Amino acid sequence: MKKKYKIDTNIFSKELLGFWLYLMSDCIIFCTLFSVYFILVDNVAQGPSGHNIFQNNLIIIETFLLLFSSFSCNLVLFEMKNKNLYMVFLWLGITFLLGLLFVFLELFEFFHLINLGFGPTRSGFLSSFFVLIATHGIHVISGLIWIIVMIKYVYTFNITNLIYYRMLCLNLFWHFLDIVWVFIFSFVYLFGMV
């Protein structure tokens, strides 16, 4: 006889407290990196500033990729509640592909800037810019690895409370990365273009 279970959807449950604390520590890291960036933004050492190097089209595409991946990541939880395995795999795959495209565009931007001679050693501004964007990119890559692990878990164990809980943590992490990206987009790229 198949065991019935009810999925707990409370994002403020005591089981998630540790993960919320982790997200807060990540938030402190990004706040520190933003502070360093804002302190060094005018230290261009006779090199380029943001309005000289930022590419509007690339940044907008990156933003849409990450925002759409957040939407698709949310649909994974919805389909888990409905116990629709096919759609869970589909939305996890779409989230993974969108995140992977985002990372490729970030790497393209980095290599493009370095090829132009605007690497992280050029100025304080570029150092802080590269560290902030690379830290976000490393977090996105970590999220992509987590998505692969979740695909394996769901494939192996089906949908259980533990799998749902892990997916909920991934979802919170992915949304956190989106929020950080919105800040990067707004305060680094948009203000940097002015």
Curated annotation (Swiss-Prot):
InterPro entries: Cyt_c/ubiquinol_Oxase_su3, Cyt_c_oxidase-like_su3, Cyt_c_oxidase_su3-like_sf, Cyt_c_oxidase_su3_a-hlx, Cyt_c_ubiqinol_oxidase_su3, Ubiquinol_oxase_su3_dom
Tagged with keyword Electron transport: yes
Subcellular location, principal: membrane
Segments on the Extracellular side according to the record's topology features: 42-55, 108-126, 193-194
Membrane side Cytoplasmic: residue ranges: 1-18, 79-84, 150-169
Lipid bilayer topology: Multi-pass membrane protein
CDD domains linked: Ubiquinol_oxidase_III (cd02863)
Any one of the GO CC terms: plasma membrane
GO terms for MF: cytochrome bo3 ubiquinol oxidase activity; cytochrome-c oxidase activity
Domain of life of the source: Bacteria
Compartments where located: Cell membrane
Coiled-coil intervals: none
Pfam family, one: COX3
Record GO biological process: aerobic electron transport chain
UniProt KW Oxidoreductase keyword: yes
Membrane-spanning parts: 19-41, 56-78, 85-107, 127-149, 170-192
Keyword entries, A-Z: Cell membrane, Electron transport, Membrane, Oxidoreductase, Transmembrane, Transmembrane helix, Transport
Subunit: Heterooctamer of two A chains, two B chains, two C chains and two D chains.
Known function: Cytochrome bo(3) ubiquinol terminal oxidase is the component of the aerobic respiratory chain of E.coli that predominates when cells are grown at high aeration. Has proton pump activity across the membrane in addition to electron transfer, pumping 2 protons/electron.
Family assignment from sequence similarity: Belongs to the cytochrome c oxidase subunit 3 family.
Record-linked PANTHER family: CYTOCHROME BO(3) UBIQUINOL OXIDASE SUBUNIT 3 (PTHR11403:SF2), CYTOCHROME C OXIDASE SUBUNIT III (PTHR11403)
Name of protein: Cytochrome bo(3) ubiquinol oxidase subunit 3
Organism listed in the record: Buchnera aphidicola subsp. Baizongia pistaciae (strain Bp)
